Amino acid sequence: MSFVGGGGCGGQDVHKFVEALQADFKTLSLETKKKYPQIKEACEEAISKLCTAGSSQQNSVYYTVNQILYPLVQGCETKDLKIIKFCLGMMQRLITQQVVDQKGALYITNALWTLMENNIEEVKVLQTVTLLLTTNTVVHGDTLAKALVLCFRLHYAKNPTIVNTAGATIRQLVSLVFERVYLEKDSVSSLQQQQSSGSPAEGEGGNQDVQTFASDAFLLFQDLVQLVNADQPYWLLGMTEMTRTFGLELLEAVLTNFSAVFHESNDFRLLLKERVCALVIKLFSPNVKHRQLPAPSNGNAPVPAEKPYFPISMRLLRLVAILIQKYHTILVTECEIFLSLIIKFLDPDKPAWQRALALEVIHKLVTRSSLIAFFCKSYDLKNHATNIVHDMIAAMGSYIRYSLINASAMLNGQQNGVANSLTAMSGSNQCGFMFRGAYLPLVATYAPGVSKAVYLEMLDKIDASNIPDSYGISVGHAILLDMTRSIGGVIQRTPELHPSHNTAVITEEEHKPLCLQLVNSSWSALLSAFIPLVETSIDEATTENILKAMQNYAALCGMLEQLQPRDAFIMAMCRASFPPHYAMSIFANTTQSDGDLRCHTRSGSQDLSSQFINSCSGDAGDFRPQIVAVGTPLPSASLPHSVMQAPVMLTNKNLQCMRAILFLAHNNGGILGTSWHIVLQTLQHLVWILGLKPSTGGSLQAMPKPAVEANVGIQTAVMADLPVLSQMLSQLFESSQYLDDVALHHLIDALCKLSHEAMELAYANREPSLFAVAKLLETGLVNMPRIKVLWRPLTNHLLEVCQHRHIRMREWGVEAITYLVKSALQFKHKTPLKENMELQTMLLSPLSELSTVLHADVRQRQLDCVLQILNTAGEILSFGWPAIIEIIGAVNEHHGEPLIRTAFQCLQLVITDFLTVMPWRCLPLCISTAAKFGSQTQELNISLTAIGLMWNISDFFNQNQDKLMSTQLQDVSILPDFPGTVKMPQFDKLWMCLYAKLGELCVDLRPAVRKSAGQTLFSTISAHGSLLNPPTWQALVWQVLFPLLDNVRALSSSASNEKVDASGNILIHHSRNTAQKQWAETQVLTLSGVCRVFNTKRELLQMLGDFERAWSLILEFIQNAALSKNGEVSLAALKSLQEIMYHNTAERTERALKDPQTAQEQDEEIWTIAWNIWLSIGMESTKMSTSTSAKLQQQNSNGAETQEDFYIPSQAFLTALIQIFPAIFQHIQVKFTAADFDKFCTVLTNAVCIPVQTDAVPYIMSTVSDTLLTPLHDGILDCMELIQKEATKPDSHISQLIPAIFRQLLIFSKFACAPPTFQQSVEHKYAKSSGHYANNASVEVVSMNYIPFGEKSISICVKLYQTTATEDSVVQEQILHDIVKALRTPLAMKYKCLSSSTWKLAISSLISVLHTGLKVARAKPQHFASLWDDLADTLDKFLFPASVCTIEDRGLEEIVLDETIDCQVIELLRDEVLPHSHEMPHQFIMQIVVLLNKGSIHSASDTNICYESDWKLREIFAKTCFETLLQFSLLEDHANTNNNRLNANVLTAGAAGAGGKDFAGRLAVTALLHRFQEVLKRFNDDERQSGKCPLPRFRLSEISFVLKAIATLVVSMKKAPASKVNKPAWDQLIGLYPYLVDCTTTTSPEVSRSLREALLQYTDLLQAPRSCSAATSNDNVIQSNGQE
């Protein structure tokens, strides 16, 4: 092999490898330079070889490997450990790189051999050998043999590490040699050719000609056999030592892993047969001859044979197991010998470990069904061969029986010299077997089909450890189970999980004889082994496994029609289900002959069984099975009297056996044949003992025992298993459906026989067993597909049972018949029962025959059956309806309520489910019958359910309309007549019949019936009314619905108001505790229902005529209900009205398009009616007059009175009323007049003033928060906005309503500050509120939050004004004045407002309307003369409110924001008023100037103000006022002419009649100077009085502001024209100078800075300006007036 092929490396890797080799050789050269010059020279030569190689370095290394190996071999001969290690490492590297050829491999092997002989680096040597053989295949033949011998030699060294390493290496290399055989395709054929040319290698050396991998493997295996046989090897020359155990292990490994080699090669096969088998038989000799006998009493022991050696025997058995498992097809005779030997190893005289090993081998073999099949085919089926299968199972049975008897004998000390290791069982949860007190626990458990050896795996043990006494029976028990499983696998041809390639093939022809032989060879031996195991097992799991095996085996026998083995196993299981004496009694008269069974099933275990039975009643210390159930014996003719008297005690094992029988019969009922009787007899006894009684469908359930049966009981644990047993019983009879007809008749005959026996006992007044009747029922149920086969015999016997005088027998006879009839009718037969009259008649015949039975209970059960038939199979009763209805109709009231209830249930099912299969003519009768049940008064639930049935009928009519319409009834007399409608179709008459009957039930005396009937009536009309012809609708409205409304109204008004008697357990809610309240509910239901129908079919009714009359009538009904004193009725009426008003459909539009004029006229008429009805409802319901208020107050004073005397409409009612208006308004807006609007506003105002009752709080609170509008308020404002929107449209018909809209909104806006009172609705619109109803604590009403409502009204008003300010009606009606007056209230209250948002909204609204309105006022002053005083007063009261606000109340940020709002007002005056003063009244301008003066100096505005808390922060406001004053009084405007005109106007309009052109301006300056003087004087006085204590900060800020203002004023006066400032003003300014000087003593830096600015401005005033030397007398007058 070349390097390239082996390494697969690239050129670069090769180059690196060569360099590494050169480096290693250089290192080796240096190491051997002195001591080993010849190695040094060889290294240098190797280096030169590597250096001088050609360009193909890969081939160079391979071709020069032998030269470069030379120094390495020499190095290994030096015995220098360091050099040897280095050389071995280089060798391993060369081997790894696969550059070593055969010659090189020989060199390496020789070198390693030398190291081995010198005991140097043994581990490294083994590693190198492993590498040499595993990395390539160049080593074979003698070189391979030498390498293997080398490893064998090291395996027997003294160092344990080397021994273990060498052992592992040998195992690996031996496997490697055989693995190579698979790689060589022609190895087998070459060996076969060699065989044909000459005899196989027997002599020394073996075959030397063929150097193949197969020959290597052959020679190796041959020598291993030689070495194990203590002979000299032929090929492995140089072997000095070889243990037999190691050789056997190697042989086992080869035979286990490479069986294909032996199967495919004749040489290997011959070697196996002639050498290996002979070796095994030879080595087995000590095991066969040795016997373990007890020591004789005289002490003279015979000379023992050679004693078997455990390690050899164990390995031999492992080898035998492999030979049998893998090579049985080529070693047939040898395997027979091996199996016979293994079976003999189970003899009692063999050592315990030898028996244990044999058991483990047998277990390995029996888990493979293919092996069992091969054994039977090769041995048991042959005439002169050993019956291996039979002998194996018989040996197991003998071994198990011996184990049990021996354990008991050892426990009782009957065997001398044997140590007693068995003790009585101490725990209760043990697994195993117990015989006569000797306990054999299960020490080994196995998964099914899996063997797990213990002693066969003790490869490291010299001797077997102590084997537990119960180990053998544990393995033997598993062997029997797996043997049964394997036999089943053979018979059923179940594939193995892990099949081998050499498994014997069983053909179809061979299979049947093989299976029969298997059963014949195994059944008696298996049964004789199973019986003692069942009898002695003490745990459920073990017993379960054994019983499963017995079930499976019995089933297999049945499959093969082997009756004797089948019956033997079934009988054994049945006997095990009872205590022994009871079993003997009940099976004494069994017709089945069990003589043969006795010879097979009890021969080996009869004594054992009797011993075991006796042991149960032996000494007190013995094991006693736990009794789990005690019951009375089933009365039977076969039971002796003694047995009848004693209770039957069942153990858990008995119940397990019962389950096993059930399982067997369930899964394999077809093979029972004549055994059915014994099986059913067994089950009947067990069912009786356990107390299982039949229940529905024939299944059995546990029933409580009578208290008198003190000696009878079932443990709790078993009670939980009883349902499982019952289910298994049911499943057993369910499986009868898979039996053929003959087998089924066998089963029914057996059940009938048992039933006759029970009937005979019942005639003797003894409690009968109902098992047979129940199971006849179950059998019939599961065999419905072939019901004709068994119906006659089955039902005839059951009818006979129904006539029995014993009530239990009779009950179950009826139960069985009725259940069978129901099931048969429900079953889906091949020919559908609906079409099979013969079968239907046959099935209903037994039910009809029951009518001849006189017993009342039978009649009840018959009716129940009819009910259930309807419930389950009514749709197929195509031929049976007359009979069914006849049975239902035969029941009348004298039969009693139960039968009436049952009859109604039948009717209910007929109507609900089976109308489709009934004749057409039955439908009116069904309606009448249902209505009759609805009106009956015996049972309310029946009445309600009957009404539900009428809905079902309507649903049926709808779904089958086509079919019903197409069917014409000949006898029309069964349909009622409806006058007034010509030629009403039969289908419509059917509907009208239904509606009329429901309408009658709607006025029943019982509220529940009325409610149900009403709901059904309207649901039916809503769902199916579209099916009626249009003329029929008129009949429905005028003959059903309107009469219904009238009847309900009349009955409601006449209903009693006394409380209903709530006797009994029925709780009646307070809202329904009188007849009147109950009728109110009916009124709500009927009115809403009729309105909904009317609304839905409005277009149809309009086309039929009389619509206006119908419209008026239904609105009258609504009005009557809406004005009801019952809140529920009134609210429902409004909802109905709302539904009608909001109705608008495409049909209406289409009708208007077809005939627009007629449609319009009709619409106007009906909507005028609707408006009048709405107005009437609104006026009447919201009329909270003084008398009503007085009643409410009277109720407060007389607390005991009820609120029944008067009625306060709820918020929901008012909200609904208001929300209806938009729908009406869109139709009447063209005719909407001012009078209509006034009435509408009256309704709105009254609705707002209605007090809110406490029970309405959840309604309000669930929809709004404190900051949102209530639904009522929201609806009112929506209506106002709707009218406003229409009024503001161009060319609107109602534009004249705009002023009225303003006034109504302003009325609402006042509620933000003054909530309404009771009387407000009848007082003047602007009357002041005299109080609030919330103040009356005893009134059960709550205060409403009107603030959002009032504020929203203000906002709407402002928006409306902004869009309509210039309208003539708005100007002429002085709406702006009204708005100002309305806003004056919140603005004057300011901080006293309920919410700060109110006055903030008011001032922002005022600013908004003034921005808009002042322009209009200037344009049309004649309409605004009355505005100005109120406006000035409003501004003054807002800017200087009487209410007090502190930082503690509102916080600093809020006060700053408030001051900003005040400044906005001043800015409005500055921008919108003062620039246009010439266009406004003089008095108003004077009031504005006074207001600005008042605000400019805050400390001088009011001497009584608390500086600490209120006005200390209004500096910005004061500054704004001051700057506005200055701008107005002194500074030049950009338009001089405007100012002159303004001043002239002021003078002209002056009240005193004497003033100059700048009168207002000078007045402002004089007032300012006077206020400055007051502030300065007060500051100086306070500072002197305060001493060293500084004044408060706000005082310092105030004086600082005044000083800055003085400085600003001086500058402004200097710049102002002379005409604007007179001499007294200058004198007054100079007069301030002394006060300024007094301020110089202040310690405040802020004041000092401001003071300095003011004093600096006085520089130019030290001498009065000449321009002011002359002052007029008029100025003096003005000055004096200003100072005053």
From Swiss-Prot:
MF terms (GO), sorted A to Z: cytoskeletal regulatory protein binding
Pfam families, sorted: DCB, Mon2_C, Sec7-like_HDS, Sec7-like_HUS
Domain of life of the native organism: Eukaryota
Keywords, ordered alphabetically: Protein transport, Transport
SUPFAM superfamilies given in the database record: ARM repeat (SSF48371)
One BP term from GO: protein transport
GO cellular component terms attached to this protein's record: endosome; Golgi apparatus
Family: Belongs to the MON2 family.
Summary of the function given for this chain in its UniProt record: May be required for traffic between late Golgi and early endosomes.
This protein's name: Protein MON2 homolog
Species assigned in the record: Drosophila melanogaster
Taxonomic path: Eukaryota, Metazoa, Ecdysozoa, Arthropoda, Hexapoda
